[in-house]
């Protein structure tokens, strides 16, 4: 964890770390390649099965949102109005409608591009969230921010006078120029990132937030701040390219230490989201 410790009245005590009870105003979106094994994790299947009215699985493709290669991706989300175009070729992109091939393939993209959401898809995600929740401020926790595509898109839109009340707090295990903290989500949860976000964005409110009887989530709700926890979870052990190394043939069962660690982290994350959002 590279973020400097907050001031004394805002320490991450064990009670605060474990205080995951949910109140109103939180949503989540999980994202991973649609053709990989992430969706087959027991914790993900149970999440969808236990909350069919509250959690949706949405599949789309990058080529329907401005990129010149297909890459199918899926979202597991509580945003009922998040409705991107179906994946190509189910909904043909403009190249396929002209009877052409996609100009490029994901394997030819840069590492940064491969690990970034298309700007138009980010627009749809954030606009759906803002239409679902009416609030004075919108706090997006980018739990696995990678190369910072969400933070970059928000800055671009704000330069155009849009989304001026949207705040992004970026976490990633790898420290980059856009990251605000570097929490290992095998050991922490987004609850800790919420504390860091308040400390970063509204430092004059940290004492008030930390002393709120309902914890920081209730303080945010009382302050008319709504939260979206977005997690584009690392896909290396779930994507088709890595299955031979990380998973036993034909299923999601892990055979590498990296895969076991990824499964543990995602189970930990989903457990937090179930407890904090879906009560």
Residue spans for each PLM region:
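Conserved active-site and SAM-binding loop architecture
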Residues: 1-279
